[in-house]
Amino acid sequence: QQPIPIWIGAAGLPTQRIRRRIGRQADGWFNLCSPEEFPELRDDIYRAADEAGRDPASLGVEAGVAVVGPREAEWKSRVVGWREIGLTHLCLRTLGGGLEKQQHIEKMREAVAELPNV
């Protein structure tokens, strides 16, 4: 793909400076906030994109959802919730579940098969 898409992430909540950079320069961002924090971040980033003459809707946003561990029972509803508030890319995670290599693969296969159609 030309040019290579540029995605930006930050540890935790991105500062205003990083939000502006994402809006001005990035093709998308790796979101690490909660769904409750997301609308404010998205609005700041979209505003920066608009001010830079870019279409905010062209920006991608990714969030990760764990399919194992303490929140395993709610992963499908989390996928639906993220999609409803604007997620464009999804990362299903199996880390932290104490699984062996083959179990990671099997769990991911199951999760993809059960992925909500949103």
List the predicted regions and their residue ranges.
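Active-site-adjacent structural elements that line small-molecule/cofactor binding pockets in enzymes
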Residues: 1-118
